[in-house]
């Protein structure tokens, strides 16, 4: 399995590309470099918001190019951010945090199948950019 980022513009790029353009660039790059024998690609979110990462994954899985690999997610921040925001370290918030985590897992499961249509709401925690300048792993 490979664990790359999607092909997205840099954080300071002024151009906003559509999910379909990101999908086409990502799948094209994979087709040029990844042998079909590789069983799957598990994408990192790369600082995208939770919703943006889900929408882009969905677009990748509906891209009209041949995709011989399973294309799914291996998100950290883009799977956990809403849950952590809801939890805030308080035991009383555990149920709300669990609900947020399950919701994001379900959304990303649908996106991995190319069946996610988007929430249409980028105003909540899921719509917040998760970009961290000079992030070190």
From Swiss-Prot:
Miscellaneous: In vertebrates, three forms of this ubiquitous glycolytic enzyme are found, aldolase A in muscle, aldolase B in liver and aldolase C in brain.
The positions annotated as site (Necessary for preference for fructose 1,6-bisphosphate over fructose 1-phosphate) read 137
Catalytic activity field: beta-D-fructose 1,6-bisphosphate = D-glyceraldehyde 3-phosphate + dihydroxyacetone phosphate
Cite the source lineage.
Answer: Eukaryota, Metazoa, Chordata, Craniata, Vertebrata
Coiled-coil region list = none
Q: Where is the active site?
A: 3 (schiff-base intermediate with dihydroxyacetone-p)
Q: Which family does it belong to?
A: Belongs to the class I fructose-bisphosphate aldolase family.
MF annotations from Gene Ontology: fructose-bisphosphate aldolase activity
- Organism, as annotated: Gallus gallus (Chicken)
Q: Name one GO cellular component term.
A: cytosol
Sorted alphabetically, the keyword list is: Glycolysis, Lyase, Schiff base
Q: Which domain of life is it from?
A: Eukaryota
Name under which the protein is recorded: Fructose-bisphosphate aldolase C
């Amino acid at each position: 399995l490979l664990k790359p980022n999607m092909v997205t513009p840099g954080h300071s790029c002024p151009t906003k590309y559509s999910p379909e353009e990101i999908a086409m660039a990502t799948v094209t790059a994979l087709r040029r470099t990844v042998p079909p024998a590789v069983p799957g690609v598990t994408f990192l979110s790369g600082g995208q918001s939770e919703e943006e990462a889900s929408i882009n994954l969905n677009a990748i899985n509906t891209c009209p190019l041949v995709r011989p690999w399973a294309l799914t997610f291996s998100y950290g921040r883009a799977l956990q951010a809403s849950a952590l925001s809801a939890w805030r370290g308080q035991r009383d918030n555990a149920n709300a945090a669990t609900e947020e985590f399950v919701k994001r897992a379900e959304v990303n499961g649908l996106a991995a199948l190319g069946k996610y249509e988007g929430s249409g709401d980028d105003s909540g925690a899921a719509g917040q950019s998760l970009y961290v300048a000079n992030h070190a792993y």
